[in-house]
Amino acid sequence: DLIDQCKIFHFGSVSLTDEPCRSACLDAAAYAKQQAKRISFDPNYRPLLWDTEADAREQIMRGIALADILKVSEEELLLITGTADLEAGSKILMEKGPSLVLVTLGERGAFYRNRTHAQLIPTYPVKAIDTTGSGDAFVGAMLWSLKDLPEEELFLGDLSQIVDFANAAGSLTATRGGAIPALPSIEEIQVCRQKKIGIL
């Protein structure tokens, strides 16, 4: 019922490390795709959770094959594609199935590519206290912004403002301690974007 009611089904590779969670997660994602839900995948690679890098790469590729929206870090881009080049790496990932690829770059911002646009969006200057949860804030803000976006605009449109919104969410999260308690409100993100600085 939860999958039937959702607009976006999001998962990561932590749930792909072992059975039976692996099969359950992949089956759920495949079912969501059959129901025409948007599928979002964030590898969130944690080396200590995997027996080998090759095993991690194999399972991550299974997740990517199901995804419409893919978010990776710079390190994951290199792991999966063999290149750290944003242009080349994002093109390789697009060929694997996703129609929107996002690469988070820490203090440099985020790069996105869909079928017609590719752009690096700078982030907001902050005094970082704890970066825990910044990536999750970025993904959450992205998916919140994309959940009602028409498919044509999602995969063909200019998403620079949406990525900027997500960058602001990630930057603000880094200015506070903890993970969930550090997540900013929509109002705080909007103020951050208006001031063009991540310190409120």
Locate each region found by the language model.
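Conserved beta-alpha-beta core of the PfkB/ribokinase-like small-molecule kinase fold
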Residues: 8-91, 108-109
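Short amphipathic alpha-helix with an adjacent loop that forms part of the alpha/beta core around
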Residues: 1-4
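Conserved phosphate-binding/catalytic region of the ribokinase-like
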Residues: 30-34, 82-200
